[in-house]
C-alpha cells in the first residue's frame, strides 16, 4: 500500500501517492468537455458512486479517510470529514437530513453526517457513529426511520437512522455483494446465488417472499418504471407485473 502517513502500512522509499492529484470531474453531458475539476486532497482509494444532496446543490463522495461535499456548479470543496479507512466501496445515502456513510478497512465505522456544514466539520457535524454492522461492499439503505446494512459476514442489520442504535440483526443465507433496494413499500435483497428476498421494512425481520433466478448475481438490481432489472453472470433480466402475467 502506498504511504501517505494516514495508513498503518509501513512506508517504502520511492512509492508514489497515486491520489495526490485525484479529482472529482464534471463533464458536459452533450459535448464531453470538462466543466470543472474538484480536488479531493488527502483522500485515499475509494470506489463509491457520488450522490446529490441538499436539493441537488452538492455532490457528496467518500474515499479513503475522507467524506467530502462539492459545489455542483463550481467544483469547490465545501466541506470534509475525516473517516479513516481504505478501499471504500459502499456509496453514501441520504435521508432525514443526514448523510449515511460506511468507511473502508482499517477502522470500519458507519457514520451519520448532518447537512449544512462548511470546512472541516469532523468535530461539529457527525450525528452518530456505529462500529457494529458496518457494510464493506453493499451500500446502505435508508427507509425511514431505519438504515439497513449488510456486513462482510452476510448479516443484515437494521439501525435507527436518528441514533445508529441497532434494532435487529438477521443472518442471511449465501454471500451478498449487491446493495439492497427499496421499491413499492418493500426491501429487496439479492444474493450472489441469485436469490432475492422480499422484506417488509420495520422494527423486526419480516420476510414476505423469496425468488431464485438460479444464476450468479453480483451487481445491484435497478428499479425503474415499475420494473426490476437484474444483471446476472449470463443474462440481463427485466421483471415487472406485466412480464409476470
Annotate each predicted stretch with a short phrase.
Residues 2-21, 35-56, 62-64, 80-95, ...:
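Extracytoplasmic beta-rich repeat domains
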Residues 2-6, 64, 104-106, 115, ...:
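Short loop/turn segments immediately following the C-termini of beta-strands
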Residues 18-32, 112-115:
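Beta-propeller blade signature
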Residues 22-25, 66-68, 109-111, 155-157, ...:
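A short loop-to-beta-strand structural motif that recurs across blades of beta-propeller domains
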Residues 108-110, 132-201:
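Loop/turn-rich, solvent-exposed surfaces of beta-rich toroidal or solenoidal domains
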Residues 110-121, 161-162, 198-204, 240-245:
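Short loop/turn segments immediately following beta-strands, especially the blade-tip
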Amino acid at each position: 500500500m502506498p504511504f501517505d502517513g494516514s495508513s498503518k502500512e509501513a512506508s517504502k522509499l520511492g512509492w508514489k501517492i497515486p491520489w495526490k492529484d485525484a479529482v472529482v470531474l464534471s463533464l458536459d453531458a452533450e459535448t464531453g468537455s470538462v466543466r470543472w475539476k474538484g480536488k479531493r486532497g488527502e483522500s485515499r482509494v475509494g470506489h463509491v458512486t457520488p450522490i446529490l444532496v441538499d436539493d441537488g446543490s452538492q455532490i457528496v463522495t467518500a474515499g479513503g479517510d475522507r467524506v467530502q461535499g462539492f459545489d455542483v456548479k463550481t467544483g469547490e470543496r465545501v466541506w470534509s470529514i475525516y473517516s479513516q479507512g481504505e478501499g471504500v466501496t459502499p456509496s453514501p445515502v441520504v435521508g432525514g437530513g443526514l448523510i449515511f456513510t460506511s468507511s473502508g478497512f482499517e477502522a470500519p465505522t458507519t457514520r451519520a453526517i448532518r447537512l449544512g456544514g462548511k470546512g472541516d466539520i469532523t468535530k461539529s457535524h457527525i450525528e452518530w457513529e456505529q462500529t457494529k454492522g458496518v457494510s464493506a461492499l453493499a451500500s446502505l439503505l435508508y427507509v425511514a426511520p431505519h438504515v439497513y446494512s449488510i456486513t462482510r459476514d452476510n448479516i443484515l442489520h437494521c439501525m435507527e437512522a436518528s441514533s445508529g442504535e441497532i434494532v435487529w440483526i438477521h443472518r442471511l443465507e449465501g454471500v451478498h455483494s449487491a446493495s439492497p433496494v427499496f421499491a413499492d413499500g418493500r426491501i429487496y435483497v439479492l444474493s450472489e446465488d441469485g436469490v432475492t428476498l422480499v422484506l417488509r421494512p420495520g422494527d423486526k425481520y419480516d420476510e414476505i417472499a423469496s425468488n431464485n433466478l438460479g444464476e450468479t448475481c453480483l451487481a445491484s438490481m435497478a428499479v425503474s418504471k415499475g420494473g426490476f432489472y437484474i444483471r446476472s453472470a449470463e443474462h440481463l433480466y427485466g421483471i415487472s407485473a406485466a412480464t409476470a402475467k
